[in-house]
Amino acid sequence: MSKKIQKDKKKTHKRKMRYRRPVNWLFLLLLMTAFQIFCAIQILTNGGEDIVKGTIIAVFALYITVEWTYFIVFAGFLRRKSFEVELIAFFLSGIGLALTTSVYPNKAYTQLIAILLGIGVFIVLLWILSDIDRVVKLRMPVAILSIAALVFTLIFAKNINGARNWIVIGNGLLSIQTSEIVKVAFIFVGAATLETLQSTKLLTKYIIFAVTCVGLLFIMKDFGTALIFFFTFVIIAFLRSGDIKTIFLICAGALIGGIGVLTFKPYVANRFNSYCHIWEFADTKGYQQVRLLIYSVSGGLFGLGLGNGKLRGIYASTEDLAFGMVCEEFGIIIAFTVLLTFVALVVYSIRYSVASRSSFYSIAACAASALLLFQTALHVFGATDLLPWTGVTLPFISRGGSSMMCCWGLVALIKAIDVKTYKRYDKVVKG
């Protein structure tokens, strides 16, 4: 009987570890390259007088070169076969680069550097994640550094747009949003702590860490990011416990706390009083959202073309209104494709979680993909007034170096779930 059970276990394990046929990355890369060249041509054709043609050509040439170099090295020399996650990241980053270059030609190199730094974060983090023992050892130092970074930001950050979440260095030369970097650390610490949950002490430590992070963000008045952190905490807790009742109690407690804050801190409620009333505040608080609704639909299925939109003239168009710009200048088809890519990352994480090497990789990947999808939902539905507007960025596409590095860090957590990512485990699977 025991032999039969053992045999069944081996069959189940083999079924879980079975190779799934990877996508044809070369065809998709060629298609993506053609799309990016088309974007560059549009910017050169429709750009204003401030467009420096040499800069545009150089930026896109460098970006495409980096893309191809990455795939040639990892597919040709390192013999990797699965590139679904990287294709999505490069596709979205390319759209962000095109929008930023089109609206702010002088910031083209800055955005390109942000993407390169993000790719660097992706590669380094993948190496760190290759060893689960290394991950567990780094858990506490990462947690301490994360709290320290948020406290430092709270003390020294400048108040920008009502929130104290930016560290400005060199008279505006460089600005860092530490909460973006802590997003990756938040999932890293949570997944590593709950990887082998053996005591209430470990769970308590993570709860203290999570509450501290959310509390500091709330004090900074960065409510959108605080909501994202809370959502991620709920996802991680559910993935580890699977207890719906516990999750319900956590959410109920948070709701009661939120109502209390809105009651005793009226200035917080005032930030959301235009929700569902943007047309009544069309020239004040609802100015950006009203323009987004008007201009984004004018793009139709195929868009007006880069440089031809009107939304680009609105304040923070490449940050807070990025999805509207995609709709207006790229069209509904590309905009819908962008949304589908975030859904695809969630599906990818769930699909590969059954064959991950440990619960850390399953928790980290599912939490990271859920965070990206939730943030996208907040951005899209907030800008269109279906949800209260929090001003969160659209992952990969909104302009910003901190956000870009965070997004590449999150996709590293997603990528690590696939055993084919690491050569030594790839051999085990084939065997």
PLM region spans:
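Hydrophobic, glycine- and aromatic-enriched re-entrant/interface helices and adjoining loop segments
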Residues: 160-178, 248-338, 360, 364
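Interfacial loop-to-transmembrane-helix boundary motif in multi-pass membrane proteins
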Residues: 81-89, 106-115, 124-149, 167, ...
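Interfacial transmembrane-helix termini
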Residues: 19-23, 37-59, 77-87, 97-117, ...
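Hydrophobic alpha-helical segments of polytopic membrane proteins
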Residues: 200-219, 223-263
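Central hydrophobic cores of alpha-helical transmembrane segments in multi-pass inner-membrane proteins
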Residues: 35-36, 59-73, 91-98, 115-128, ...
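A juxtamembrane structural motif centered on a specific transmembrane helix
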Residues: 2-19, 35-40, 377-431
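Hydrophobic alpha-helical transmembrane segments
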Residues: 62-66, 115-121, 183, 329-349
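Loop-to-helix entry and N-terminal half of a specific, functionally important transmembrane alpha helix
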Residues: 352-391, 397
